[in-house]
Structures are given as structure tokens and as C-alpha cells.
């Protein structure tokens, strides 16, 4: 490996003579080999033949020749980089040519799935891109995708490399391909303001304007970041300004992010100001109560437009006179000012020392850098450019910036936690833009004006998406339960026209009551940990007593230590990077596939502060494509606030210390005035709300209700056990609970639930891997010490016995009569979330299978058709008003006490499922998504778009499914609004629930479902076929989701539902005295094997292998209800 290591190093550093020398040994070796052929054949002459003859009979010479053999030109280092990767990334054109002449392959991917073409496109070197495409022994595939499903065109478009984009378009690169975040190259160019690239893509492919998703459009992305020219070009090209996504129209995005100029452009283009987002808010509603000056100006613009006036209040193009930044800091001590001047000087010295560096990849050129590029951070120039833009927003023209030949990649916006932790807002109210704005006064050099400064709002809190769940993150912008539920009241039960296709193959559905569903959260489903909902963000009663220490994320240190705090108070410089504006360091990931999963999901964390000489400190940024994470979500996303609230509680010491300062609130006001005056539109209200979470936890329930203006409900909450603010989180207090305790106003219920989302969730029992040592300590952690005696006297003396509790025992045995206390207990049981009717049946291990399976083959609603209820035991609580106490009043249903007695007498083994790889021979995964109990007693809810249904005249297995997917997808491309439904999956079938009013639309029995498959052209689209028992016709129902992982999980959950039904049937048949002669056969055919999408999967890995056209070669996955457990037969009901 010695010579190969030398070749890698020479290619990386561009040492052409070394590369040629090393590869000449390879040619020499090949010459000896050729002569050997002649010598061994007896006809070779000359030295070559002689050498070959000796080599064939002499082992020592053979060994000598092997020493002369050159290195493998396609060798790789620890990151999977070949010499060609290194040369392409670092722009060494001559080295690339030599490598290609020596048979270097262009189709070798590194560990992140990147090909040399990706790196050259990202670098912006059009010459190397041409070489890779047209030269070499292998044919470069221009549409090859990396692990993030990005093509070379994505890389070039994101960073504005117009020459590379031109070359790739000439080579017929597909511009409609989407990465893992469903972004096309046009989306990325619009997101980062790459105007020329946007024009080139639209000129080459005008149809890109119609290739939009419900998640975003190029217009939304450009409006969000204030790219005026890009917005204008898109509108001129014919993009619909009223196109709606989850966030509403582009006007919502521009207004929310304070882009006044874009708002004016959109209003002039005739954008409908009455469009509402998924929360039912118009753009005007979104900004009306925001406290920043810019938000008020935007609200005035929209109001003037609505009243038909031509704005006389139009925002003045020239910002109001700004006080000098030095004078704006009069409230800071002289010592602090001295520290700031010192920090500014050192920062500028550091900038000047690096002014000659070429771009954001300079660290990759250094000969001393390691081969593993994961650890490399880039330098200064990109951040310098972006901070120059921010300085412009402050009305100051930054100077000393040298022009660049190619546009730099956009600066990665600093996450809010980092910004607020690095610069204590009380004692260092300077942003990076303010620091740089002092530079002209120090250097006196000419300034450079730029047109746009789109990233000014990215310093505000909550502009990024933080997902703190596992790698299979489902990017649901909002949970279904967060939607407005007013429309659920008084529904007439009629099925909307757009859902009529779902009735094919559906069981009869009785009218559902007025109460909406509270759908179960699926085990694999996650919710973004962003900011609280808009309604909770705008409470005017939020006070200004928060601390200057920003609440850190879960992955960051919880509070500043005392030494750092002393440093702030005394004005003494500290070496910790948090106390200096120049150390805004971000996670580095140096190539297009370089972001790790945590980085991609937005859960960025800063490296632990290190003490370095200040001369070594640099503004660093991530080179990963994932810096768009901060730009793809707004501050109004639903929040899962548990971890954030927990970290807030850790800041109480720092809070108390800083609140002792008498000028604390006034200085916050001063800081907000400064930020507002420089036109950055920074909204501090959300940060204050997060910090105020600490104060909220110290309030009583009455004080908390008073803070949200609902103090009239204090007695109702207290009398029903909702008596502690620490235990009012979203996993305890739900809408049905508020109905039950007498809060009838839906607006008030929604307001209460929104406010409760900012409270911490009840921690699940054993959430940290350690169960409480005793029942008393567990109850004490829940604030329920009064029940200790009741638990112990009733035999619940260990944590294991507590885990087997259900609500019936809490009421009848333990006498926990208060609803809030019961909800608190059940919420702490991690494996059984309380989103079920009050009469929860025992866990599956406590129930005999045959007691359930008498209704397996019955229609889903058959047993309850006369009572007007659905037969699903555990659909969520909102469906029929808690089922009017369900089985307790159903004479046909056995009581839980009786079933528990049967279980004690005849204990059954817990249901065991075959793994997917055994249940389906071609399944690529090894485990199911859920516990069997989830599909038996509960339901798995998924949100999806319903594209429609199609009659299948000639059933050809999954081929019919895939054909229907393609046809329905094309037919709905131009639909402005696609209906949203919720799929509620159990072992009995699938229920379809209208997401807008939570009414059940249709039910498909498990026995009537077959041929579930993904669309091979769009893995977010899937479908299955049902059989209409009345007409014997087959219908294919087509759905789409916003995430490939979610689509995969839905199909896998359907497969698990078949497996559960199959195993239940087997156990029921075993338990009968006389076995049944035969059981009904159920078959479902999944798609061709679709490997589980991962961050590390390229598109080529997602493409199914070619197979024959028989049933098994279609990867049929059959869950067979058969008396023989080992039966391999598969009878189709089609």
C-alpha cells in the first residue's frame, strides 16, 4: 500500500511528476508481462522475450517484477477516495488527464456515494467536468446520484457554477431528479439565489415550473430568502404565485421571514392574500402580531393592498438613520467595549491573513491535511461574503473584500443556539455583521455594494428544523392532531367527491360521531423540534425578564459555567470560544455527501469549546449541502418541546444570577431596538418564549392560564387532576380531555393545547435506560405521592407490576379518580401511549388470541353496524366520543375482568411474528416496524395524499399497481389541491380518515388488499389493489407522501398487518379442539424489493433488479392463513 498511498497524496496535492513516475512503473510492469507472453510461447525475441522466459521458470525474478509493478490507479483511501477523486476535487486538471490516460475509472463512488464528477461539479471546474465525461476508459454517467440522491447538477446549481451547469445540460443531465429532501437543481438554485443558474435551467427545461411538491416550490424557497431577482424571473416565466404548500403561498414565506421587497413583488403579481396555510392563517395573520418593525411594515403593506390603496405607508427604501454602533453600546462598561475592540481587531487580522485564499475549499489543498476529508473545515471566504451582506443590511458597506471569479457557496447560517451562546446578548449585543461593519472605520478602504442580503433573518431563533429522532426521520411538518378541528363539529358524514374512489372494495362504514380522531403517533414517526405554533408565539404577555443565556439544544452544554459568567460581568477576556464573536464555528462536512445523518436532519451541535490562540480562530462553515436545512422550514413548525424544556430547566442558575441585574429588561429593550434599526427584522419574541419556558415551569396552573388569557378554566383543570404545570404537556392533556372536563369552546381548547405544547412532556418510564428503583420514587417523580399507599396495599410494589397497569385498574383498584392523574401515570408508561379510549384492553400477552380472532374475517364494522360504531377496538379517542364507554356497555363484548381471569387460567404465549425476511423471502429487512400489540389493540396512523383510484381490467400483479401509479401521478400533476387523508392500519384492515374533519371515509378489509407496491419512478408514490366483493372488480388506490421513508414504512406496516392476522389465525386454529379443514387464504403482493431508504443509499441501490414475470420473481410477499404453520402455499383471492 506504500506506493498507492504515495499516488493518493500526489494526486491530492497536484504533484504531476510524482504521479507520472508512479504510473510509469505500472506501464513498465505491463511491458514485462507482454514480453513474458512471447517468451513463454517460444517465439518471443529480444529482451522482452528473454525476460518473460526467465520469469516463467524463476520465482525470484517473478518476485522482483512484482516489486516493479506500479500502484493500482484506482486504489482508495479510508474515505473511498481514489486518486481521481482527489485530483478532481482539488482542481488538478493535468493530474486528471494523466490518471484518465492510465485507466482511472470515473464510476467509482466514495463512502458518501460521490463520484469524481460530483466533486468537480461542486468545485466548479468545467474543464475537469468535460474531461471526466469525454475521456477515460469508462463512460461517465451524468445522472449518477450520491447517498443523498444528488446529481452533479445539484452540486453545480447549489453553488452557482454556471459553466458547469451549462456543460451538464449539454450532456443531457436530467434536471428533474430530486435529492433526499425532494429538491431539484432548480430548487437549490432558487434557494441560494443563483440567478443565472435559474435562468439557464428554465430556458433549457421550461417544464420544471410544473414539477412541484406539496413541500416547497422554487418560488417559495426564493421568497423565503429574499432573492428578489429570482422571484421576479420565476414569476415572469409563468410560475403560479398562488401555488400552495404546507406553509401556504410564497407570500406566507416572504412575510414570515421579513422579506419586504419580495412581499411587494408578490402583491404586485396578484398573489391572493386570503390564502391560508395548514394552520388556517393568512400571511397577514402570520405577521400581524410579530413585534419587529419589519413585520409591522409588511402587515401594513398587505392591509393597504387588501383595501385597494397604493401603499402610502410603503416601506421607505432608505432605512431610518442608524446610531453608530459604538454609541449604541453606551450601556456597556468601558472594559466590555475594550474587549469588543480587541476582538474586532483580532478578527480582522485573522481575515486579512487569509484574504488571499481562493475559496471555501482551501483546507482541501493543504498538503498536511489528512486523507479523510470528513474532518476538514473550510476557511473564511464564504462566511465573509455572507457577513458582508448582513453588514449591508445594517447600512454599512463592508470593505477589504476581494472580488472572486466564481460565486462562492452560500454561507451556512449560524444556528440559533450557537449564535446566542457565543455572544451573550446582554454584554455583547454585537452580531457578526456588526463586527464587520466596524471594519471600514478601522481600515478606511473602499466598500463594495451588493444588491441582496437574503440571510439577514437567519440569525433569528427557530429558523431551522431540529429533528431529534432516529435516522428514519419522517419530515412531517405538522402532526395531524395539530390541524384545525373546527370543521369536525357537525359533519354530516357524507363522503367528499374526491374520496369516492376509496369506496371501491370498502366495507360499510357507519356514521362517525362529532368528535374528531386523536390519531396515534406511529413508533417510527417523528415531529420536528422547531418553534411553538404561531398562536403560542404571539402572546403579548411575554415579559422581558429572560436571561441573556440562550437555551441550548439537547446536544449542547446546558449552561455557561461560572468562570465564563464572571468573564462577562467583569469584562475580562476569556479563552472560551463562546465569548468571542469570531468563533462562530459550525460542523464541517466537506463534500456533497459529507453531512452525517444528524447534520442532515438539522440537529447540528457545536463542537466543545476549545482554548486556542485567537490568531488561529477562524469563521468556519459547513461545506455540506445540508446547509439548506436551516432554510427549509419556518419558525411556525409544531414543536416537540420535551428536550428543549428539559434543557431550559438546566439554565435556572444562570437565569437567577442574571436577573439580579436591575438593568436586565431595559438592556433587552435596547438590544431589540438596535436589531430593529439595522433592518434585519430579527424577532426576539420566540427566543424569549423559549427562555420563558423556565419561568413557566415555576408558575402555578392559575398563573399559567392567566398568561394565556384563559384563567376562567382554572377550577376545571384543578378539580380534574390537571394541577401541575410540569405535567400538562402534549402527551398528557388532549382535546378530548378538555371536552370531558367541560371546556366546550373549540377556540379555547385549541388555545390551551397550543400553549401546552411548549410545556415539557411527561418522561416515559425508563426513557434514560434506567427504571426508577421503586414505585414510591416513580410516583414522586410524577408528583403523585398521595397514591403510594394505594399502590403498595394493592400489590403494585415493583416497577414490573406497574408496567402491566391499564386504566380500568387505575379507576377500580387503585382509586385514581382524577382524569389528569390517570393521564399522567399512563403517559409515563413508555410502551403504551395514552391515545386510546378509557377502557383500554389488557396487553396482548394477557389476552388469549382466540378471544380476538372470532372477528378476524368479519368486515371491520360488522359487529357494530347496529350501534353506529366502528369495530376497531382501539381507534383513537376522538372517533365516537370515547365510544360511550365502548365494551363496558356492549353486551356482546366480554368484560376486561373476565378476559383477565381467562388469561390467568390459561396463559398464552405472546404472539411471535416471523421476521420480514422469512415471512417474505425477498424482503430486504430483518425486523418489523411495530410491536404486534400496536396493530391488534391500537392502530398505526399515517398521513398521505390520495391521488385517486383506477379500475384494473387486467390484473397482472404488482405490474398493474405500478402502471396505475404512473397514470394517476401524471393525471394529478396539474391539480392545485390534492386531498389529504390519514391511513389507520390495524390487523383487520385500513381505515381512511379525512384529514380535514377526521371523518372515516372508507375501510378496506385486510383480506381484500393485495399487490401493494411503490412507484419505481417516484418512490414517494405507492398503491395497492382492492377487490369489490359486490362487482368482483379490482380497483387500484394510489397515494403519495412527502418522504420516501414514510412510504416505505407504510408498505412495511401493511405487510406486518398481514403477518399479525396470519399468526393470530394460526394460534386460534391450534387452540380449537377440532382443527378447521381449511382457512381462508390471504395474499398480498408487495412491490419489487425496495430496500429501506437510508441516507447512505444511492438511486442505483433503490432500483429493483430485473426479474422474470412469474409470481415469485415479482417478489410476491404472501401472508397465508393456513392450518399448517410451515405451509408455503400461496392462494390468491384475485
From Swiss-Prot:
Modified residues (Phosphothreonine): 318
PTM-bearing positions, type N-acetylglycine: 2
SUPFAM superfamilies, alphabetized: Ankyrin repeat (SSF48403), PH domain-like (SSF50729), SAM/Pointed domain (SSF47769)
Repeat (ANK) residue spans along the chain: 79-108, 112-141, 148-177, 181-210, 214-243, 246-275
Any Gene Ontology biological process: substrate-dependent cell migration
Modified residues (Phosphoserine): 507, 620, 622, 624, 626, 628, 647, 661, 663, 666, 677, 887
Listed CDD domains: PTB_Anks (cd01274), SAM_AIDA1AB-like_repeat1 (cd09499), SAM_AIDA1AB-like_repeat2 (cd09500)
InterPro entries per record: ANKS1/Caskin (IPR033635), Ankyrin_rpt (IPR002110), Ankyrin_rpt-contain_sf (IPR036770), PH-like_dom_sf (IPR011993), PTB/PI_dom (IPR006020), SAM (IPR001660), SAM/pointed_sf (IPR013761), SAM_ANKS1_repeat1 (IPR041880)
The keyword Phosphoprotein is assigned to this record: yes
Keywords from the named record: Acetylation, ANK repeat, Cell projection, Cytoplasm, Phosphoprotein, Repeat
A GO molecular-function annotation: ephrin receptor binding
Highest taxon in the source lineage: Eukaryota
Tissues with expression: Widely expressed (at protein level).
Basic and acidic residues compositional bias, start-end: 305-317, 382-392, 613-628, 1123-1134
Major site of localization recorded for this protein: cytoplasm
Composition-biased stretches (Gly residues): 33-55
Annotated region described as Disordered, given as residue ranges: 33-57, 305-338, 375-422, 469-498, 569-650, 856-896, 1079-1134
Description of post-translational modifications: Phosphorylated on tyrosine residues in response to EGF and PDGF.
Polar residues: compositionally biased ranges: 328-337, 572-588, 633-650, 856-868
Compartments in which it is found: Cytoplasm; Cell projection
SAM domain mapped to chain residues: 696-762, 770-837
Subunit structure of this chain's protein: Interacts (via SAM domain) with EPHA2 (via SAM domain). Interacts with EPHA8; EPHA8 kinase activity-independent but stimulated by EPHA8 ubiquitination. Interacts (via SAM domain) with EPHA6 (via SAM domain).
Listed PANTHER family: ANKYRIN REPEAT AND SAM DOMAIN-CONTAINING PROTEIN 1A (PTHR24174:SF4), ANKYRIN REPEAT AND STERILE ALPHA MOTIF DOMAIN-CONTAINING PROTEIN 1 (PTHR24174)
Described purpose of this protein according to its UniProt entry: Regulator of different signaling pathways. Regulates EPHA8 receptor tyrosine kinase signaling to control cell migration and neurite retraction.
Designated name of the protein: Ankyrin repeat and SAM domain-containing protein 1A
Encoding gene per record: ANKS1A
Amino acid at each position: 500500500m506504500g506506493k498507492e498511498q504515495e499516488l493518493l497524496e500526489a494526486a491530492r496535492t497536484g504533484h504531476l511528476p510524482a504521479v507520472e513516475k508512479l504510473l510509469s512503473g505500472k506501464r513498465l510492469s505491463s511491458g514485462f508481462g507482454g514480453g513474458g507472453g512471447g517468451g513463454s510461447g517460444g517465439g518471443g525475441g529480444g529482451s522482452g522475450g528473454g525476460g518473460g522466459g526467465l520469469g516463467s521458470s524463476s520465482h525470484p525474478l517473478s518476485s522482483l517484477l512484482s516489486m516493479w509493478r506500479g500502484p493500482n490507479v484506482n486504489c482508495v483511501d479510508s474515505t473511498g477516495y481514489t486518486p481521481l477523486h482527489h485530483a478532481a476535487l482539488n482542481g488538478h486538471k493535468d493530474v486528471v488527464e494523466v490518471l484518465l490516460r492510465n485507466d482511472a475509472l470515473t464510476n467509482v463512488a466514495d463512502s458518501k456515494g460521490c463520484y469524481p464528477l460530483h466533486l468537480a461539479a461542486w468545485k466548479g471546474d468545467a474543464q475537469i467536468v468535460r474531461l471526466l465525461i469525454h475521456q477515460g476508459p469508462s463512460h461517465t454517467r451524468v445522472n449518477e446520484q450520491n447517498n443523498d440522491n444528488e446529481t452533479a447538477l445539484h452540486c453545480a446549481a447549489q453553488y452557482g457554477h454556471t459553466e458547469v451547469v451549462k456543460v451538464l445540460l449539454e450532456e443531457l443531465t436530467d434536471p428533474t431528479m430530486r435529492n433526499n429532501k425532494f429538491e431539484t437543481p432548480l430548487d437549490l438554485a432558487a434557494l441560494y439565489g443563483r440567478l443565472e443558474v435559474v435562468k439557464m435551467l428554465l430556458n433549457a427545461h421550461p417544464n420544471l415550473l410544473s414539477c412541484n411538491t406539496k413541500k416547497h416550490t422554487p418560488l417559495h424557497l426564493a421568497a423565503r430568502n429574499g432573492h428578489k431577482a429570482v422571484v421576479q424571473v420565476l414569476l415572469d416565466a409563468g410560475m403560479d404565485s398562488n401555488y400552495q404548500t404546507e406553509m401556504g403561498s410564497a407570500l406566507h414565506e416572504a412575510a414570515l421571514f421579513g422579506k419586504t421587497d419580495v412581499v411587494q413583488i408578490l402583491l404586485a403579481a396578484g398573489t391572493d392574500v386570503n390564502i391560508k396555510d395548514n394552520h388556517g392563517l393568512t400571511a397577514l395573520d402570520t405577521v400581524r402580531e410579530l413585534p419587529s418593525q419589519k413585520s409591522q411594515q409588511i402587515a401594513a403593506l398587505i392591509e393597504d393592498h387588501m383595501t385597494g390603496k397604493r401603499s402610502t405607508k410603503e416601506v421607505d427604501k432608505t432605512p431610518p438613520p442608524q446610531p453608530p454602533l459604538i454609541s449604541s453600546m453606551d450601556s456597556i462598561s468601558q472594559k466590555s467595549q475594550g474587549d469588543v475592540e480587541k476582538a474586532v481587531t483580532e478578527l480582522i487580522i485573522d481575515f486579512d491573513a487569509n484574504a488571499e485564499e481562493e475559496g471555501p475549499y482551501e483546507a482541501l489543498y493543504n498538503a498536511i491535511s489528512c486523507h479523510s476529508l470528513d474532518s476538514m473545515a473550510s476557511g473564511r471566504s464564504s462566511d465573509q461574503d455572507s457577513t458582508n451582506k448582513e453588514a449591508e443590511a445594517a447600512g454599512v458597506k463592508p470593505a477589504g473584500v476581494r472580488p472572486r471569479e466564481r460565486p462562492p457557496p452560500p454561507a451556512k447560517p449560524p444556528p440559533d443556539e450557537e449564535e446566542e451562546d457565543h455572544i451573550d446578548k446582554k454584554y455583547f449585543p454585537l452580531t457578526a455583521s456588526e463586527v464587520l461593519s466596524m471594519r471600514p472605520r478601522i481600515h478606511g478602504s473602499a466598500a463594495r455594494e451588493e444588491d441582496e442580503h437574503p440571510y439577514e433573518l437567519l440569525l433569528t431563533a427557530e429558523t431551522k428544523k431540529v429533528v431529534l429522532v432516529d435516522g428514519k426521520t419522517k419530515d412531517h411538518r405538522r402532526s395531524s392532531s395539530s390541524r384545525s378541528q373546527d370543521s369536525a363539529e357537525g359533519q354530516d358524514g357524507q363522503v367528499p367527491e374526491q374520496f369516492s374512489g376509496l369506496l371501491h372494495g370498502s366495507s360499510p362504514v357507519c356514521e362517525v360521531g362529532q368528535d374528531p380522531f386523536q390519531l396515534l403517533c406511529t413508533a417510527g414517526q417523528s415531529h420536528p423540534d422547531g418553534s411553538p405554533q404561531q398562536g403560542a408565539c404571539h402572546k403579548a404577555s411575554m415579559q422581558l425578564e429572560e436571561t441573556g443565556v440562550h437555551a441550548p439544544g439537547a446536544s449542547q452544554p446546558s449552561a455557561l459555567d461560572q468562570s465564563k459568567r464572571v468573564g462577562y460581568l467583569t469584562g475580562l477576556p476569556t479563552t472560551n470560544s463562546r465569548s468571542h464573536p469570531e468563533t462562530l464555528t459550525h460542523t464541517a462536512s466537506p463534500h456533497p455527501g459529507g453531512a452525517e445523518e444528524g447534520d442532515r436532519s438539522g440537529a447540528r451541535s457545536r463542537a466543545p469549546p476549545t482554548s486556542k490562540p485567537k490568531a488561529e480562530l477562524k469563521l468556519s462553515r459547513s461545506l455540506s449541502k445540508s446547509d439548506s436545512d436551516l432554510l427549509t422550514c419556518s419558525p411556525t413548525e409544531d414543536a416537540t418541546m420535551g428536550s428543549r424544556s428539559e434543557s431550559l430547566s438546566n439554565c435556572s442558575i444562570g437565569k437567577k444570577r442574571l436577573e439580579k441585574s436591575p438593568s436586565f429588561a431595559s438592556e433587552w429593550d435596547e438590544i431589540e431596538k438596535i436589531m430593529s434599526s439595522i433592518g434585519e427584522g430579527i424577532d426576539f419574541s420566540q427566543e424569549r418564549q423559549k427562555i420563558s419556558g423556565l419561568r413557566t415551569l415555576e408558575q402555578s396552573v392559575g398563573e399559567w392560564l392567566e398568561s394565556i388569557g384563559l384563567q376562567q378554566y382554572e377550577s376545571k383543570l384543578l378539580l380534574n387532576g390537571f394541577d401541575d404545570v410540569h405535567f400538562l404537556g402534549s402527551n398528557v392533556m388532549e382535546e378530548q380531555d378538555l371536552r370531558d372536563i367541560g371546556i366546550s369552546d373549540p377556540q379555547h381548547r385549541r388555545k390551551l393545547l397550543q400553549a401546552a405544547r411548549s410545556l415539557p412532556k411527561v418522561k416515559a418510564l425508563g426513557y434514560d435506560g434506567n427504571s426508577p428503583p421503586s414505585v414510591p420514587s416513580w410516583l414522586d417523580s410524577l408528583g403523585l405521592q398521595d397514591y403510594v399507599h394505594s399502590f403498595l396495599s394493592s400489590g403494585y410494589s415493583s416497577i414490573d407490576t406497574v408496567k402491566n397497569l391499564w386504566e380500568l385498574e387505575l379507576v377500580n383498584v387503585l382509586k385514581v379518580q382524577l382524569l389528569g392523574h390517570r393521564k399522567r401515570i399512563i403517559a409515563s408508561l413508555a410502551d403504551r401511549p395514552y391515545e386510546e379510549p378509557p377502557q383500554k384492553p389488557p396487553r396482548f400477552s394477557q389476552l388469549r388470541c382466540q378471544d380476538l380472532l372470532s372477528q378476524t374475517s368479519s368486515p371491520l364494522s360488522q359487529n357494530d353496524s347496529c350501534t353506529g360504531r366502528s369495530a376497531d377496538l382501539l381507534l383513537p379517542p376522538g372517533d365516537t366520543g370515547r365510544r360511550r364507554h365502548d365494551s363496558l356497555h356492549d353486551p356482546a363484548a366480554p368484560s376486561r375482568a373476565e378476559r383477565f381471569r381467562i388469561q390467568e387460567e390459561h396463559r398464552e404465549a405472546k404472539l411471535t411474528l416471523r421476521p420480514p425476511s422469512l415471512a417474505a423471502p425477498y424482503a430486504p429487512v430483518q425486523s418489523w416496524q411495530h410491536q404486534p400489540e400496536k396493530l391488534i389493540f391500537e392502530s398505526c396512523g399515517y398521513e398521505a395524499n390520495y391521488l385517486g383510484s383506477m379500475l384494473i381490467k387486467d390484473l397482472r400483479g404488482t405490474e398493474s399497481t405500478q402502471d396505475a401509479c404512473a397514470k394517476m401521478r401524471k393525471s394529478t400533476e396539474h391539480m392545485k389541491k390534492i386531498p389529504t387523508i390519514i391511513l389507520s392500519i390495524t390487523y383487520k384492515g385500513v381505515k381512511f380518515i379525512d384529514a380535514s374533519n377526521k371523518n372515516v371515509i372508507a375501510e378496506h378489509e385486510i383480506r381484500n388488499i393485495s399487490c401493494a407496491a411503490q412507484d419505481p419512478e417516484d418512490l414517494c408514490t405507492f398503491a395497492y389493489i382492492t377487490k369489490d366483493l359486490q362487482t368482483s372488480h379490482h380497483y387500484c388506490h394510489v397515494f403519495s407522501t412527502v418522504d420516501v421513508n414514510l412510504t416505505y414504512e407504510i408498505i412495511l406496516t401493511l405487510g406486518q398487518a398481514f403477518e399479525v392476522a396470519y399468526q393470530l389465525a394460526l394460534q386460534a386454529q391450534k387452540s380449537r379442539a377440532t382443527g378447521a379443514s381449511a382457512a381462508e387464504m390471504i395474499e398480498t403482493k408487495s412491490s419489487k424489493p425496495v430496500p429501506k431508504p437510508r441516507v447512505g443509499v444511492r438511486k442505483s441501490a433503490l432500483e429493483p433488479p430485473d426479474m422474470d414475470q412469474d409470481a415469485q420473481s415479482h417478489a410476491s410477499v404472501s401472508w397465508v392463513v393456513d392450518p399448517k404453520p410451515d405451509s408455503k402455499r400461496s392462494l390468491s383471492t384475485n
